[in-house]
C-alpha cells in the first residue's frame, strides 16, 4: 500500500537497515511488521518496543494484539546449489532458494521447481543446474552495497520506489524484467555504489 512504501524507513536505522510496515486485512485488522537487515539478533522486547513506538507515532493507541510471530531469513548469495548431485538435491531455503535481496522464498521456489521439472522431463542431470543468472549477480552486488552502507542502505530501497513505478520494481524483484527495464532501474539510484562493488569483486576474483 501507499503507507507501506511511504513510512517503512521512517524508523531509527541504528546503523543498519530497519523498516516497519502495516499490511491491513480489513478496516480494523492488520499485520504490523518490524524488519531488520542485520548480522546480529536483537531481543524480542526491542522488537515489540519499536512496534509500539511506531504505532504511537501514528496515533494508534487503542488496539488488541491477536497474535505474534517472528522469523529469521538468511540473506545470502552462498551457492548452495554447487553441493547438489544427481541423487541429492537441496530445495527451499536449504537449497538457497530464498531471494537474497528480499527474503522472498515461495515465488522464487515455484520458478525453480519449473526448472527442475524441465530437467527431469528431458532426463538431464540435476547436478548441472545452476541458479547463477544475472539476477543472482544483482543480488550479490546489492548485498555488498547494503553491508558497506553503514546504515544508509535504506536510501537504496527508498530511491527504488520513489523514482520508479512500483509495479516495475515488483516485476524486477520477481526477476521478470528485461535488461532494458533493469538498466532504467539501475540509473534511478546511485549507480556508482554498485559499480564500485562490481569492480571490487572483479579485483578480488570473487564474482
Predicted regions and their residues:
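Short, small-residue-biased leader/transition segments that mark boundaries at the very start
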Residues: 2-5
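FAD/FMN-dependent oxidoreductases across multiple families
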Residues: 12-14, 38-115
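Short, surface-exposed coil-to-beta transition loops
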Residues: 16-19
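Hydrophobic residues embedded in beta-strands of well-ordered beta-sheets
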Residues: 29-30
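A basic- and aromatic-enriched beta-loop-alpha substructure that forms the phosphate/nucleotide-
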Residues: 33
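C-terminal helical "tail/cap" subdomain of flavin- and related membrane-associated enzymes
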Residues: 114-207
Amino acid at each position: 500500500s501507499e503507507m507501506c512504501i511511504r513510512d517503512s524507513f521512517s524508523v531509527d536505522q541504528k546503523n543498519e537497515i530497519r523498516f516497519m510496515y502495516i499490511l491491513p486485512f480489513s478496516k480494523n485488522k492488520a499485520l504490523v511488521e518490524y524488519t531488520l537487515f542485520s548480522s546480529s539478533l536483537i531481543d524480542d522486547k526491542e522488537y515489540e518496543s519499536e512496534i509500539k513506538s511506531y504505532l504511537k507515532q501514528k496515533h494508534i493507541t487503542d488496539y488488541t494484539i491477536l497474535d505474534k510471530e517472528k522469523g529469521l531469513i538468511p540473506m545470502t548469495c552462498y551457492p548452495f546449489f554447487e553441493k547438489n548431485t544427481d541423487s541429492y538435491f537441496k530445495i527451499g531455503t536449504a537449497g538457497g532458494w530464498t531471494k537474497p535481496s528480499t527474503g522472498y522464498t515461495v515465488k522464487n521456489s515455484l520458478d525453480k521447481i519449473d526448472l527442475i521439472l524441465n530437467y527431469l522431463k528431458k532426463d538431464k542431470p540435476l547436478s548441472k543446474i545452476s541458479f547463477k543468472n544475472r539476477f543472482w549477480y544483482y543480488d550479490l552486488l546489492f548485498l555488498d552495497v547494503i553491508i558497506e552502507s553503514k546504515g544508509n542502505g535504506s536510501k537504496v530501497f527508498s530511491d527504488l520506489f520513489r523514482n520508479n513505478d512500483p509495479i516495475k520494481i515488483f516485476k524486477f524483484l520477481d526477476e521478470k524484467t528485461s535488461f532494458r527495464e533493469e538498466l532504467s532501474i539501475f540509473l534511478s539510484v546511485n549507480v556508482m555504489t554498485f559499480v564500485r562493488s562490481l569492480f571490487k569483486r572483479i579485483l578480488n576474483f570473487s564474482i
